[in-house]
Amino acid sequence: MKTLRYLLLFTASLTIASCQGKVNSQANDSSDKNSGSPVTIYYFHGEHRCPTCLAIEKETKTTFEVNLSKEAEAGTVEFEVINADEAKNQALCEKYGVYGSTLLLVKGNKTVNLTNMAFSNARRNPDQFREELANEVKKLIKG
């Protein structure tokens, strides 16, 4: 019985840990040499995802398809979902220092990490999540 209890505790801890990406609320202020490059919304995730992780992907996709549809059609924004646990994505994960659930906006040399905002709002305040994500993307598009 104790073994089962410890196994369940370990599994729960592992699941929660896999939902925590490298969280830095920062923007790299390097000069953007590719001002014409699109903003890429990267949502990185692991194999095991919690309800909040699933909500982040769902709400990011909704934002991309609804709130940013004109920008997507114009080619100024794109959205990619990346499984951080797959070997083929290792180089991209290392490039951005990602090992779990992480939401990044990238344009040229500039990176904005929205992971904290995503975990705070995707499930409980999806309207606020979509508004903040769309605003951040539009700021990057404008430069």
Q: What does each model-found stretch correspond to?
A:
Residues 1-8:
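Bacterial N-terminal signal peptides that target proteins for export
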Residues 15-18:
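C-terminal motif of bacterial Sec signal peptides marking the signal peptidase cleavage site
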Residues 20-22:
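Bacterial signal peptide processing site
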Residues 34-66:
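Local sequence-structure signature of Cys/Sec-based thiol-disulfide redox active-site neighborhoods
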Residues 57, 61, 65, 90, ...:
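Extracytoplasmic/secreted envelope proteins and their assembly/folding machinery
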Residues 72-88:
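Thiol-based oxidoreductase modules, predominantly thioredoxin-like and allied folds used
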Residues 93-107:
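Structural micro-motif
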Residues 105-143:
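Non-catalytic, surface beta->alpha helical segment in thiol-disulfide oxidoreductase systems
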